[in-house]
């Protein structure tokens, strides 16, 4: 008889949408997160403890980004700012394994937003484990399309 593990694994599957990104230099510099969506999974089961928020970026959404996510400037006018939800968001993700497709993009934006608060908040990977599902997919399916759409098909 084998012993069953009693370790609790808490994962947060997370995605962000942004006002855009830079092609040169830091991809996040001067841009903002406008949506955070996160789903909690404990021991491989959905808990229903999700985190979702739209954010007012105090800048316009680039047309290219709007073409990707369809989130309009007008829709965001009455939403909270990142600063207003930062503590709740940090409490939600703290200690979890974050599972993010193309994690460098989202983590770059998250760390940038935290840095703008001027509160000496450490990098996300110091209080969360980060797993990049794109990197995992590339290892599992080398040479294949690894977009979320392709992986879900």
Which residue ranges define each predicted feature?
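Conserved non-catalytic scaffold segment of RNase H-like nuclease domains
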Residues: 2-127, 142-153
